[in-house]
Structures are given as C-alpha cells and as structure tokens.
C-alpha cells in the first residue's frame, strides 16, 4: 500500500508478520488465559477440590480454538495437544498461576503495567490464530468464504465459543452465558478479523497479508489497551453493531400490536378470552354460594 511506503512502515509490517510466537507470546497467551479461568466464580474451589478438572479447563482455555477448528475441519481434536513443548509450557503456567507459593506469579501478573504487556502480547497471538485458521480452511476449501470465516473465528475465539462445555468440566451449567447469545468483545473482534482476513485471502480486499496483519494487530492491541486503562467495556464496534442491528434486524410492529393500538384509540374493549370467561363464571358461582 502507498500509505505504508509513505510512512516507511513496510519493513515494520513485514517484520511483524515474521515474528515468532514461541515461546514468549505463547507464554503470555497461556498466562492471561489461565488468569481468566482463575477469575471465574468458583474456579479456586475447583482447583482445590479437583486439580485434574482445573487443569483440563485451563487447557480448554489455552487450546480451545485449535481444538474447535480441528473438529470443524474433521481433524483429530487432540492434534493441538500433540505439541508436547507447548502443552508442558501451558501446564507450567497453569501450575504457577494457581499453586505458586504465596500467589507470587498471579499477584505480579495482576499488576496493571505487567498485565497490559501480557494482554497486548495475547492480542498479537490472536491475529496469528485467526490468520492460521483462515489459511488452513483456505487450503482445504479454496475460495469457500463462509468456511474460512467460520474456521478463522473458531481458532481465534474458540475458548469463548466452547465456554459452556468448559463450564461443565467445572460442574457449572449456565446456558445463558452462551457466546452466540451474548458475544463478548474478544469474540466480536475475532469475528471481524476472520471476515477481513477471509476477504483478503479470497482477493476481495486489495491488500497484502502482512499489511493487513499489521493493521489488525495494531487495532486490537491499542483498543484492548485503551479499554483496560479506562476500565470501560465500550469499543469501536459498538456503533457499527448498533447500526447494523437497527437497519437489518429490528422487526416492525406485529399485527397483534397494531390491533391493540387501534382498539385503544377507538375506546373499544377487547373481547375476553375463553379462560377469562370461565374464571369470571367460577367467581360468580362462589359469590352465589
């Protein structure tokens, strides 16, 4: 893009696209994921009652996206756990966050400056996960836009999308927390990334991959940092989401509502239903008796 050449950002964007995630960025992802689990209601009790269930829930938080995307592509769901090094690293982070003496690791990671850095690094890994999912789907189903979006979304936000299953591991059942019913910010921003990367891979967006990677990473990191510093849940997607909802999905008044309004204006009283008639007759018979 000419903008990148004008501001001499080509080398920075290309360098970011070649940045290795292991071990430091993966470690940040594991720490923040396990901390998110620990901060769930009742998670500490589960860690004392059943360390195995706590470990399994932590691995779902860390590798849920890879597991879900593997299922969608008819691959073995345990394939993401075949990397012993990553699995051991995630297990080490789980142990330190939950069982480190004096809670040293969790207390240090909870400090705002360090948590900002770790969260920013986790957002960088989100970009790579989304792009990896889109590319993986594109290699099997070329130009299948919907499949690429779905797999990229699953790989980037799978931990949230399978949260109901993860809750069952901890003995919790809250179907109202389904991410599809009420999506959290990470799920929304991951869906946005899956859409734009899929459009780029299908050549609907005239932009190079490393340029789009730089733009999306910059957007997610700066926005997440702003939200943490301000302690606010508002994000730039709220306005777009509200506009699309009001434009496409708000239903007009139903016929029943229209009839009710018309009767109210005319001063007419709607006829009682059969159940109401039976109730009144029963009350009248009681009074008579």
From Swiss-Prot:
GO biological process: fin regeneration; regulation of bone development; regulation of bone mineralization; regulation of release of sequestered calcium ion into cytosol
GO molecular function: identical protein binding; potassium channel activity
Transmembrane segments: 19-36, 50-73, 86-103, 108-125, 145-162, 184-201, 211-230
Region (Disordered), start-end ranges: 260-289
Subcellular location: Endoplasmic reticulum membrane
UniProt entry keywords in alphabetical sequence: Endoplasmic reticulum, Ion channel, Ion transport, Membrane, Potassium, Potassium channel, Potassium transport, Transmembrane, Transmembrane helix, Transport
Record flagged with keyword Endoplasmic reticulum: yes
Domain of life per record: Eukaryota
UniProt key word Lipid metabolism: no
Membrane side Lumenal: residue ranges: 1-18, 74-85, 126-144, 202-210
Recorded topology in the membrane: Multi-pass membrane protein
Positions in the Cytoplasmic compartment: 37-49, 104-107, 163-183, 231-289
This protein's GO CC annotations: endoplasmic reticulum; endoplasmic reticulum membrane
InterPro entries for the chain: TRIC_channel
Catalytic activity reported: K(+)(in) = K(+)(out)
Modulation of this protein's activity: Channel activity is activated by increased cytosolic Ca(2+) levels and blocked by luminal high Ca(2+) levels.
Subcellular location, principal: endoplasmic reticulum
Residues that hold a 1,2-diacyl-sn-glycero-3-phospho-(1D-myo-inositol-4,5-bisphosphate) according to the record: 122, 126
Basic and acidic residues compositional bias, start-end: 278-289
Functional description taken from the UniProt entry: Intracellular monovalent cation channel required for maintenance of rapid intracellular calcium release. Acts as a potassium counter-ion channel that functions in synchronization with calcium release from intracellular stores. Activated by increased cytosolic Ca(2+) levels.
Family, per entry: Belongs to the TMEM38 family.
Subunit structure of this chain's protein: Homotrimer; conformation seems to be controled by binding to diacylglycerol (DAG).
Name assigned to this protein: Trimeric intracellular cation channel type B
